[in-house]
Amino acid sequence: MSEWESYYKTEGEEEEEEEESPDTGGEYKYSGRDSLIFLVDASRAMFESQGEDELTPFDMSIQCIQSVYTSKIISSDRDLLAVVFYGTEKDKNSVNFKNIYVLQDLDNPGAKRVLELDQFKGQQGKKHFRDTVGHGSDYSLSEVLWVCANLFSDVQLKMSHKRIMLFTNEDDPHGRDSAKASRARTKASDLRDTGIFLDLMHLKKPGGFDVSVFYRDIITTAEDEDLGVHFEESSKLEDLLRKVRAKETKKRVLSRLKFKLGEDVVLMVGIYNLVQKANKPFPVRLYRETNEPVKTKTRTFNVNTGSLLLPSDTKRSLTYGTRQIVLEKEETEELKRFDEPGLILMGFKPTVMLKKQHYLRPSLFVYPEESLVSGSSTLFSALLTKCVEKKVIAVCRYTPRKNVSPYFVALVPQEEELDDQNIQVTPGGFQLVFLPYADDKRKVPFTEKVTANQEQIDKMKAIVQKLRFTYRSDSFENPVLQQHFRNLEALALDMMESEQVVDLTLPKVEAIKKRLGSLADEFKELVYPPGYNPEGKVAKRKQDDEGSTSKKPKVELSEEELKAHFRKGTLGKLTVPTLKDICKAHGLKSGPKKQELLDALIRHLEKN
């Protein structure tokens, strides 16, 4: 049966794209723009390194910010970024507060902004900062946060996330000035109430950085984070980059759904996408004259009168046999509606029953939403703990949205894991694994199995043991994508040529040969015949009768049977391979299609 389609094709294609796009290949889209302000302490202590070869805390901060800028240019160029220095000699801000310097207002990342940050790196950057901005000490953190709040309020665009990242190595910025400290805490609380998150990226200082002195009451802890867990101070650029990446990564919920455990037991959960295949960004159409992005708009017209059709004027149809059935849009939507959006618990199964071959697509992640239904976190945590203890999975029916077919899914419990920096490596919650239906399973045609003898098995075991290494999925990047992004980066920053990417997916041939030694040759001697050359040309098999011409195809039908089919008009019931063999046997020329074979054969039989 054909699919429901629009009575006017163009309208249907446009709506089909809109309806189906969220569920294709696990790609998910979000509304609104992320906005992020980098707030950097510019006091003298930030420009002092702990050792001769070590970077200064200010240098680490600038390099980290620059790294985020370049990645945003490639992946999220619509997001808004800003850089603000505080503790400066000169001031530059909209409210004329002292010792606060707004280097860059909230705007899209671009090449000029990255190059401007590049001027503050290294010894030359230190001198440039001293000449253009200078160092100060008499600042108020409440005024600094006020300036950041004004930067957010000056933006007229819709923002999905507002975040401030504070880089400093001073754990008690106001010392004994309790009035300034109190005002800073009050202002931080005001920002929290307006949906602005403040994250601390604290750097190493002599004697250690104590978060509890001042910043514990200042920084924002998200609902899904533990108040008692704080990052350790960063002494290396790699540690700081990891912290920034962990905080800067978008934590956007795909949907918020009801999770029904029974008739009267319901909690609210959020569905998150943790892993998604990286693809090249879609090309953007530009207007030739101004180089501005253009938007495509589709209009539907009546083919007879040429008048513009409104959405209410169009119908959807299905051709069933020779009859065209026309339905209203609401009726087709009703046909697609199986259930209300949500998760419904069907039962529990042992974890061992979930097999690797059940994999269909990347899993999603389920986490409680306490803000919508009070008590969801407690009930969710109890369910997670019991599933881990009993080693079971929850089998559920999952309906992501209206007008979407339900899926059967398995909720696999997952415990939280932290690394040595107290950064969350694995979140605690449920992995939502999509289960296959019966028609998703296929029979794979295997080649003939050749059994190896014990000596060959032992030799291969030794080879595998020599080539073992610890696998990390993030150690292997897609070389095509990485080179594409490097080329974009070179274009954006006006570089002469892009940096060449090392393809880490290629085998390290020299290292493999060094590890294996003579094992590879010994294995070849055990498996392959003497003198075997895998790179040599395969010798053609000799014909049974060298003097004869090519063999005639084997025809299973006799002449009488063929003529009987012709008289009854049942030649069309013969398969394409059979028709090809008959045509070859009679020396008939025809195309590869069945109708062409039939036409040639019928003409031949009519003549004879």
Swiss-Prot record:
<dbReference type="GO" id="GO:0005958">
    <property type="term" value="C:DNA-dependent protein kinase-DNA ligase 4 complex"/>
</dbReference>
<feature type="modified residue" description="N6-acetyllysine">
    <location>
        <position position="29"/>
    </location>
</feature>
<dbReference type="GO" id="GO:0071480">
    <property type="term" value="P:cellular response to gamma radiation"/>
</dbReference>
<dbReference type="GO" id="GO:0003678">
    <property type="term" value="F:DNA helicase activity"/>
</dbReference>
<feature type="modified residue" description="N6-acetyllysine">
    <location>
        <position position="329"/>
    </location>
</feature>
<dbReference type="GO" id="GO:0051575">
    <property type="term" value="F:5'-deoxyribose-5-phosphate lyase activity"/>
</dbReference>
<dbReference type="InterPro" id="IPR006165">
    <property type="entry name" value="Ku70"/>
</dbReference>
<comment type="subunit">
    <text>Heterodimer composed of XRCC5/Ku80 and XRCC6/Ku70. Component of the core long-range non-homologous end joining (NHEJ) complex (also named DNA-PK complex) composed of PRKDC, LIG4, XRCC4, XRCC6/Ku70, XRCC5/Ku86 and NHEJ1/XLF. Additional component of the NHEJ complex includes PAXX. Following autophosphorylation, PRKDC dissociates from DNA, leading to formation of the short-range NHEJ complex, composed of LIG4, XRCC4, XRCC6/Ku70, XRCC5/Ku86 and NHEJ1/XLF. The XRCC5-XRCC6 dimer also associates with NAA15, and this complex binds to the osteocalcin promoter and activates osteocalcin expression.</text>
</comment>
<dbReference type="InterPro" id="IPR047087">
    <property type="entry name" value="KU70_core_dom"/>
</dbReference>
<keyword id="KW-0456">Lyase</keyword>
<dbReference type="GO" id="GO:0042162">
    <property type="term" value="F:telomeric DNA binding"/>
</dbReference>
<feature type="region of interest" description="Interaction with XRCC5">
    <location>
        <begin position="371"/>
        <end position="480"/>
    </location>
</feature>
<keyword id="KW-1017">Isopeptide bond</keyword>
<keyword id="KW-0010">Activator</keyword>
<keyword id="KW-0488">Methylation</keyword>
<feature type="cross-link" description="Glycyl lysine isopeptide (Lys-Gly) (interchain with G-Cter in SUMO2)">
    <location>
        <position position="315"/>
    </location>
</feature>
<feature type="cross-link" description="Glycyl lysine isopeptide (Lys-Gly) (interchain with G-Cter in SUMO2)">
    <location>
        <position position="554"/>
    </location>
</feature>
<dbReference type="GO" id="GO:0045087">
    <property type="term" value="P:innate immune response"/>
</dbReference>
<keyword id="KW-0234">DNA repair</keyword>
<dbReference type="InterPro" id="IPR036361">
    <property type="entry name" value="SAP_dom_sf"/>
</dbReference>
<feature type="compositionally biased region" description="Acidic residues">
    <location>
        <begin position="12"/>
        <end position="22"/>
    </location>
</feature>
<dbReference type="GO" id="GO:0005524">
    <property type="term" value="F:ATP binding"/>
</dbReference>
<feature type="modified residue" description="Phosphoserine">
    <location>
        <position position="518"/>
    </location>
</feature>
<keyword id="KW-0227">DNA damage</keyword>
<feature type="active site" description="Schiff-base intermediate with DNA; for 5'-deoxyribose-5-phosphate lyase activity">
    <location>
        <position position="29"/>
    </location>
</feature>
<feature type="modified residue" description="N6-acetyllysine">
    <location>
        <position position="459"/>
    </location>
</feature>
<keyword id="KW-0597">Phosphoprotein</keyword>
<feature type="modified residue" description="Phosphoserine; by PRKDC">
    <location>
        <position position="6"/>
    </location>
</feature>
<feature type="compositionally biased region" description="Basic and acidic residues">
    <location>
        <begin position="1"/>
        <end position="11"/>
    </location>
</feature>
<feature type="modified residue" description="Phosphoserine">
    <location>
        <position position="558"/>
    </location>
</feature>
<feature type="modified residue" description="Phosphoserine">
    <location>
        <position position="475"/>
    </location>
</feature>
<feature type="region of interest" description="Disordered">
    <location>
        <begin position="534"/>
        <end position="557"/>
    </location>
</feature>
<keyword id="KW-0832">Ubl conjugation</keyword>
<dbReference type="GO" id="GO:0006302">
    <property type="term" value="P:double-strand break repair"/>
</dbReference>
<dbReference type="InterPro" id="IPR006164">
    <property type="entry name" value="Ku70/Ku80_beta-barrel_dom"/>
</dbReference>
<feature type="region of interest" description="Disordered">
    <location>
        <begin position="1"/>
        <end position="29"/>
    </location>
</feature>
<keyword id="KW-0539">Nucleus</keyword>
<dbReference type="GO" id="GO:0043564">
    <property type="term" value="C:Ku70:Ku80 complex"/>
</dbReference>
<dbReference type="InterPro" id="IPR016194">
    <property type="entry name" value="SPOC-like_C_dom_sf"/>
</dbReference>
<keyword id="KW-0963">Cytoplasm</keyword>
<keyword id="KW-0238">DNA-binding</keyword>
<keyword id="KW-0391">Immunity</keyword>
